[in-house]
Amino acid sequence: MQPLDAVYLQILKNLCTDLSEPVPLDGVDPSALYRLAEKHCSLPFLLPYFEQQPQFSALKQQTKQMLLSYYQLEHFTRLTFSLLLAEKIPCFLLKGISLAANYPIPEYRKLGDLDLYIPEKDAFSRACRILNAHGYTEEPEESDHHVTYRFTFPETGRSFTLELHYRIVGIYQFSRANELVDEIFSASHLKPSFVELYGQTYPVLPPTENVFYMLHHMLKHYLYSGFGSRLLCDFTLYLERYASEVNFEKIHFWCRESKIFHLYDYK
């Protein structure tokens, strides 16, 4: 392992395990470390180690932009949920601010778009009509598991993306995996858990189902575009918080049945 990678991983380890071990930057190019963290959307994690580095000012500026984007997406999440819940449309918040809540500083987890899952077909169709009626514009995209919408706040001109999922993940070539995923994440099977974020209560996947979803989500990223440290941090921090509520026997069985056991190390 290269020294640069070792230093970066130690910084992530400190974050994910709540450690405060010193991470000397001797022998590591700070500019290269900055670029690596930027590539993995984790620049704010460098703040405790970069106070004496020439990149510190740029690092603080980038962090401020991430904080602004975080709260803007939180507002977009709240707005979208309020529209759907007002019409009694059952939906689940995937990833996003629900995973960021597990970080020591949630705002340091970079957010991209908003992902919602609606397992009921009729409810999904109703949701699409409601979104269209409230200024959400459907974006052309080839997807086998979600519809993409774009919403622009007229006051600021800032636009945000919503991925509205009718399947939890894309379709596999292995039919048994599709059958199992459809069964586990069906409307009849799923019973929501709830998290309170900034005074708003959101329905989310139960811990066992969420771990299984995150494994499939990581696999899809690995197969099509690769994945970086953010997904691993998400997974680690989620398990740190919810491991006692996860049925690992079920995870073990589901992973074997869907042929993704190579991504899951059962201990």
List the model feature ranges, each with a label.
Residues M1-G112, I118-K267:
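Conserved NTP-donor binding/palm subdomain of two-metal-ion nucleotidyltransferases/polymerases, i.e.
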